[in-house]
């Protein structure tokens, strides 16, 4: 094991013992904020230290087996123990490296998923609708809840833009690598010559702020406009100015919400989306900085990157970041995203491990 890794683990072991002692003190238990913080740290360190202690035990057993080699009667048993121990040490080293990888603090958060039609006009809007259905179907499989926050329907179906909130355990950790450009190649229903058209949509996956106050928003930086919600023919159309548009002046970010009949609820929802977008900008900047040092294409933070192509005539989906091609487009469009998402997570973890090894 590398010295830097061993030092890190020895410090973690010492810290866990400190935490055990602290958590046993009545005055610590009386301070709920402090107690919660310490128990969270204890829960994070326990699995790592547990593996480290197993590792130290195997090391000690190896030393004993090494000494047994001098005894002719015990040599065969000692050699078998040394072989088993060497394999177990390699296994534990790999597990420890993975356990030490930095955790994304947003992984367990709910998300706002934003899909925008790009090049391709009506066909792009229709594809935005297909993407929303794909993510909704995936969310249903995970037993997550999906609610539309804001929508701007396309002329012939689909969406020019749609924002949904997805509520569920690990939503951000599973879908965070979906941000970027999604390109579709297919023959539109309106195409009489059977020609393949290419169009695109942009997806942004943003972790929901635990509360709006978590993101520093100066009220003086906001322009808030109200207007009447629009509705399709025959639908209820508000007679009051219930729709809300919030403009964040320093960044130019604009959020509109008009899906609720209550101006108050629309305003609260718009503020939540704005907070998520501002938080997302911070994450993008951080990811771009990290990506430039680790040369990783996954989670680079660049929303303009084309990340995936959906080729319907060939039944093919290609993720360009990891050169993965799957010939199961119908299943994927019906929410079968597991194989894609697992491959992206594995590649991201491999990049993190490479960085950790480089530091060592």
Curated annotation (Swiss-Prot):
Protein name: Peptide chain release factor 1
Listed InterPro entries: PCRF, Pep_chain_release_fac_I, Pep_chain_release_fac_I_sf, Prokaryotic/Mito_RF, RF-1
Pfam families for this protein: PCRF, RF-1
Family, per entry: Belongs to the prokaryotic/mitochondrial release factor family.
Entry function: Peptide chain release factor 1 directs the termination of translation in response to the peptide chain termination codons UAG and UAA.
Keyword list, A-Z: Cytoplasm, Methylation, Protein biosynthesis
Region (Disordered): 285-305
GO molecular function annotations of the record: translation release factor activity, codon specific
Post-translational modification: Methylated by PrmC. Methylation increases the termination efficiency of RF1.
